[in-house]
Amino acid sequence: MSPCENDTPINWKRNLIVAWLGCFLTGAAFSLVMPFLPLYVEQLGVTGHSALNMWSGIVFSITFLFSAIASPFWGGLADRKGRKLMLLRSALGMGIVMVLMGLAQNIWQFLILRALLGLLGGFVPNANALIATQVPRNKSGWALGTLSTGGVSGALLGPMAGGLLADSYGLRPVFFITASVLILCFFVTLFCIREKFQPVSKKEMLHMREVVTSLKNPKLILSLFVTTLIIQVATGSIAPILTLYVRELAGNVSNVAFISGMIASVPGVAALLSAPRLGKLGDRIGPEKILITALIFSVLLLIPMSYVQTPLQLGILRFLLGAADGALLPAVQTLLVYNSSNQIAGRIFSYNQSFRDIGNVTGPLMGAAISANYGFRAVFLVTAGVVLFNAVYSWNSLRRRRIPQVSN
């Protein structure tokens, strides 16, 4: 038992603050190494333009792939042993792997360690599950929206800090600095997160079929998982072509990298501002209304992105898109809370994370394939079509959920 734990009631607001800090630190740690990942791959002996592109893509994607595979296992363990234990396991495990990455001598070692990083991850979904099971239901939207800004903040600041550190100290030391950040996250979680959890034996655990039958509406839960996947596909599809699209719009300018970085980061800034506010609004009017409205708003913003003529126009549209995106995942998570029990929260949030990771892998592949065959502008139109399908699918699933409630 940590020093912060005693018999007094759990202060969920303090836990939310500490969990936010943990998500910020892990978000920053993950993104610290992203700016120079291809450079590190090259330093490990990969040469040639095509080989470098291939290996950079593989080592980037394999983390999400293995995270998708491992998340349900960790979610089940969280429901048995407690969510705090999973937070500690994730932070410490990732910290150790980061140290080993800094010591890697060839690309195969690095690839295995990137896969191991995915296997040992899971801080954010377990933080979501912890807060979701402690916060009052009528504040779920605000709490989960606020929590989501932690990871976004870390992901925004991480690349800038990582680039500066790599320029100042070299590539390998950044991995050791990242490990230190994760170890700090471990100790903050150990001493300041409180959870009253009664461990459940393996025999008492609900099996998959029992988990499904315990749900109020299994089809709705599945539709929310699909929505999470499509949200990440839509976000990731634009990532591979954004810099090239900005260069096409900007023409011959010397600071295209800076402009691209600004346009890449503005959605995150907008999400930081919108997520808590729209989450609070969702607590008042219903997260399903926020979800459908934000999806439709996203479609209406993605279509004109295909027709912009300047980087400024693209930047404004992406800022507005970020404001809508800031509401999407918290709304999905709030609906998951409303439609499942605390007993299975760890698994539900982990399954959702698996779908999110699959979207992180498939989104960039989809964007790259479309741009290679039809050009950059087609990516935005196809992505708008995918999000429109998601809006119709989600609306239909949520409408069916309301019909029995009205008849009753």
From Swiss-Prot:
It is a multi-pass membrane protein. It comes from the Bacteria. It is found in: Cell inner membrane. The keyword Protein biosynthesis does not apply. One of its GO terms (biological process) is response to antibiotic. Its main location: membrane. The keyword Cell membrane applies. Confers resistance to fosfomycin and deoxycholate. This is Multidrug resistance protein MdtG. It comes from Escherichia coli (strain SMS-3-5 / SECEC). The lineage of its organism: Bacteria, Pseudomonadati, Pseudomonadota, Gammaproteobacteria, Enterobacterales.
